[in-house]
Amino acid sequence: LLKPGIKIVVTEGAGVSNTSGTGTWEDIAGRLGKLSDVTAFRQNIVVYAKGSGASFKAFQEMDADAWITWPDWPITHDDVLDQVNIAAARTIWRDVNVALSPDADPEAKEFLTFLVSNEAQEIMLTEGWVR
């Protein structure tokens, strides 16, 4: 991804449609503490898309070489995407944050309990998410 001429698509909400994916590319590029890596990576970005759907579209339309995204995209679109794992030293791990209001109804509480169950973990794994 740092070699000149590689075409990369990234998700960048620009304050409009920020998601957990916004800026992840900077975490990957700068993970080893080298500003030169961030600079080289930045020079290869051809699209800063707002949201993963727009990123997917841009990746296809630009005939890009790489798209920094979450594991569910290549799993659910394996007819057009290939997942390529990056070096372990650059891997970024994110959690799924869930907040339950003190006034939440019982169904919300049940759903949260379900999310941490073995059954839910098996479902999440089918989309590439691990706990």
Locations of the language-model features?
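Exported/periplasmic ABC-transporter solute-binding proteins
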Residues: L2-R131
